[in-house]
Amino acid sequence: MCNSFRIGVLGLQGAISEHVNRLKELEQQPVVVKKSTDLHQLDGLIIPGGESTAIWKLIEENKLYEPIQNFANEGKAIFGTCAGLVLLSKTTIGRDYTPTLKLMDITVQRNGFGRQKDSFEATIQAKYMDDSYHAVFIRAPYIESVGEGVEVIASYNDKIVAARQKNVLVCAFHPELTDDDRFLEMFLTMISSNKNFNHV
């Protein structure tokens, strides 16, 4: 990577260290975000996998809802993986209701591929990638439907598992658990090409 960006990893619960380590390997500057001031001077934000309900409660407790909304409205890039996908969605369906950030016009089926025992790995085809991608699904959700302006990036068994809308990218799997950095590189490209980007 030619450019090194300050990228926040929401550090409330879930796969925090895995994302931090992956970003370091890509010569980026990870910042663990636990309070609103941690968002200052960031070029992008990752909302990692974990337990979406637990992460949401901590977002509220740490008064991060509006700061994350403002971050997105400024045009800064956000990447949500697994639970992060759920939290960024407009609507969720499933047994338990989960409040969300409503930053992407998608409807998500929580734990759509099953619970922990149903975790699996699969080869998928993704837009903008010449070769197949090996994806790790852990209690993975999937996208039931997308609104206008949402670009489908990848599907598995006719279920949408990666998508983008403007400055928000999501995937149902865990890119930080593989050696294939193409989804993270897609996110870094979004940061680099952001018209509002002013690197400090």
Curated annotation (Swiss-Prot):
Task of the protein:
Catalyzes the hydrolysis of glutamine to glutamate and ammonia as part of the biosynthesis of pyridoxal 5'-phosphate. The resulting ammonia molecule is channeled to the active site of PdxS.
* Gene Ontology molecular function terms on file: glutaminase activity; pyridoxal 5'-phosphate synthase (glutamine hydrolysing) activity
Keywords attached to this entry: Glutamine amidotransferase, Hydrolase, Lyase, Pyridoxal phosphate
Per the record, the GO terms for biological process are: glutamine catabolic process; pyridoxal phosphate biosynthetic process; pyridoxine metabolic process
Please give the organism: Oceanobacillus iheyensis (strain DSM 14371 / CIP 107618 / JCM 11309 / KCTC 3954 / HTE831)
One GO cellular component term of this record is: glutaminase complex
Q: Per UniProt, where does L-glutamine bind?
A: 50-52, 110, 138-139
The similarity annotation says: Belongs to the glutaminase PdxT/SNO family.
User: Cross-referenced CDD domains, in alphabetical order?
Assistant: GATase1_PB
Is-annotated flag, keyword Hydrolase? yes
Q: Which HAMAP family match?
A: PdxT (MF_01615)
The positions flagged as active site in the entry are 82 (nucleophile), 174 (charge relay system), 176 (charge relay system)
EC number(s) per UniProt?
A: 4.3.3.6, 3.5.1.2
Name used for this protein in its record: Pyridoxal 5'-phosphate synthase subunit PdxT
Q: Which gene encodes it?
A: pdxT
Q: InterPro entries given for it?
A: Class_I_gatase-like, PdxT/SNO, PdxT/SNO_CS
Identify the pathway.
Answer: Cofactor biosynthesis; pyridoxal 5'-phosphate biosynthesis
- Provide the assembly information: In the presence of PdxS, forms a dodecamer of heterodimers. Only shows activity in the heterodimer.
- Domain of life, source organism: Bacteria
Q: Which reaction does it catalyse?
A: aldehydo-D-ribose 5-phosphate + D-glyceraldehyde 3-phosphate + L-glutamine = pyridoxal 5'-phosphate + L-glutamate + phosphate + 3 H2O + H(+); L-glutamine + H2O = L-glutamate + NH4(+)
PROSITE patterns assigned to the protein according to its UniProt record, in alphabetical order: PDXT_SNO_1, PDXT_SNO_2
